[in-house]
Amino acid sequence: MLVGSWTYRIPNSKAIEAFNVASQYFKKHGAVGSSIGSLLGRDNGLYVVNIGYENWTHFGEVDDKISNDDQWGKDMDPYFSETEWETMNFYEPFFHKMESDAGVKPIFAQWMFFHQDMNLIQEKGETFIKAWMDSGATGGSVGRLIGKNDGSYGFAVRFNSMKEYGIAQDKLNSEEYFSNHRDFLDAVDWRGFSLMRILETTWE
């Protein structure tokens, strides 16, 4: 799996409208799924669109088709003229445990970080995802970022609501769960935390 992620500013009145137009083209040209979310934290006030692909080849196929679709430009230009682009990253997961949640507009808690040991990132990522899911998360993922934040890694956990995220965070904090992993966490270079609320999605 591969996810392309764009963060940007656009008038609130146009955000969903623009996404609904764009998502039709990504679906038409074969993307796995698309979503739009609003962000709190590191990228506070930004919107983010995430597009799913099977792999890099599939990304190239979809991108070529959209780039050669004249109607795409005609339909999207009015929105692009009001868009201020911030970042673009591809996300490649090392470990991804996220069952389908069709019909749900979930919440994601997301950390960006760096650590020198990629194998340890995967090992600890799997361990932390299990702990979060035991505390109420409905899925989790850890992997690397390629693009604006090249060289960074991402860790995310999914919840059905912001309250469920808060309950899980309080539970793990009260149990001092992460104090048992201080050797790893103290060696992490933290690069940002954000909460993403999914506003619309075509993922199944």
What feature does the model see in each segment?
Residues 1-179, 183-204:
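Short S/T/G/P-rich N-terminal loop/turn motif that feeds into the first structured element of a domain
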